[in-house]
Amino acid sequence: MRKNSNMSKILPPIYIAGPTASGKSALAVKLASKFDSVIISADSMQIYRTLDIGTAKEDISIREKIPHKLIDVVDPNEEFSVAEFARLAKTEIENAQNSGKLPIIVGGTGLYFEALLYPMSFANTNKNDVLRESLQQELQNFGAHAMHQKLQSLDPQTANRLHENDTKRVIRALEIVLSTGKTLEQNQDERQKPDVIMVALNTDRDVLYERINKRVDKMFDEGLVQEVLSVGDFSYQSMQAIGYKEFANCNFSVENGKYVVGDAELDQIKDKIKQHSRNYAKRQLTWFRKYDFVKWFDINDVDGAIEYISQKIAEKTALQ
């Protein structure tokens, strides 16, 4: 791997986004082969230890060659917030820059990018401790479903992105809309555009959906059933994710130390995961398309993306 030519330069963070199965990680790895880099995951599921197959973590052999951060941070029974991600990611970005390395932030979790691209507004937007306490009390009295329905009536776009059991983010979204009278997106539209290098990958819908379907098939071939059912407690935040929550009510047995699900039910679960993944890809595209500072590339134009990023890095470091 070639070292960066000028170690005194502070290399700018590179942001790589896009829908699931679009090849984001592969682009990050290829970029890291050109620059001495640290890859920082912006994926809300890859932070969980042992959840490897359903979260499509990069192969361990690659992670041993190229430093990967914010993967395997907490156990599946632990919760992890956007604020925690932002704090850890900021530290990893600074550590990489102080070591003369290129920080590459890659993933598909929109709120994680939001926290890094708009740190001040994300952290400080209309915090209201009294309102938050009131909302927390409502949560205790009426439950997660009722709070999610409340958000659905006030800010349906944000509600559609959040699972009802993701109560921290539901409460935060309610706090913002009730404090400002504006939806999360309306608040975001008023912010100043960040001066960052960010690319995103996409392709024709049919091609993307086929890639998603093949990825899901591969996950099952690699042992997704065993991974999910070995955790088993679907009350965990980690188990609310696509690829895991679909197993919540399945019937299974244990044979020779392995979890076994009937073929017909397994096919239904697999189809649900594919459908949910395709729907998630639509939501990801909607999220990242609202960033008008993003440069989009087709998934087959990885070289073009790397050339663009390299040019932007040269422009930014030339000003130092």
For the regions a language model picked out, list residue spans one by one.
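Phosphate/pyrophosphate-binding catalytic cores of soluble transferases and nucleic-acid-acting enzymes
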Residues: 2-320
